[in-house]
Amino acid sequence: MNVTVSMLDSVGAAGLVLWAVAMWAAVGVLAYANRGRVRPWVYQLSVGVIGLGVVGQFGHVQEHVAQVAYWIAHPNDKAWMTPLGTGLANGLGQVAPDKPSLGMEILHLTGNFIFLAGLVGVVLITRRALSTKARKWGRMGVLMQGIHGVEHLVLTLSVALGASQAIGLSTWFGLLEPGPGLWTYRIWWHFLANVVGSVIFAIAVYHLWCERRQVAAGYHRDVPRPRAPEPAAAAEHTPVPADPGAR
């Protein structure tokens, strides 16, 4: 099937991929820089990564909400995508025009990795505040979204490698025949995964806001304090009182 791809679709698709790559490059820098001495810029960059993750997931989850809304009205129809999602999928699908569903798989894979990077940002920024609730919820989100991300990676690779349909948990590993049963199962599987993940992310960000002073305090450079004299050194400089009986 020939699909006309506009310049806007191509630019949007390239921009989305660059967005994800930039976020993961930042995550790598943060993970390395946060291991040693305190670097205040790590805090600011982590906030930026989290913010981009929030924006990305806000758009991503809306696509799934729209799909479910369409399914409610047309439960026997093939999964629907918004015009924006369709355009981005068409742009991404140019990497392999002979695989019509690959663009859609890459789109959701990219969206999920943007989401995952935002959650990793929460874990990184709280590395010096281990007892915070934000860190607990952030780690929970990374675990769940990590599994979800692997699912999308498997779905994408299966299509890219020539499978007749995507293979993964959300397709019963390719055992479900294309039709209303498969479409319904996959639509709701990914909708619930994204909604639950988004709620966890929202709770993590909420606690991060409430605990922001505690988290930020870990990135303040300590002012060096004068060292207390060693006991032996102090004894050497202590004057010995004169013996009153000595002449």
Task: Indicate where each model-derived feature is located.
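A positional/structural detector of protein chain ends, strongest at the extreme C-terminus
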Residues: 246-247
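Solvent-exposed, extramembrane regions of membrane proteins
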Residues: 241-243
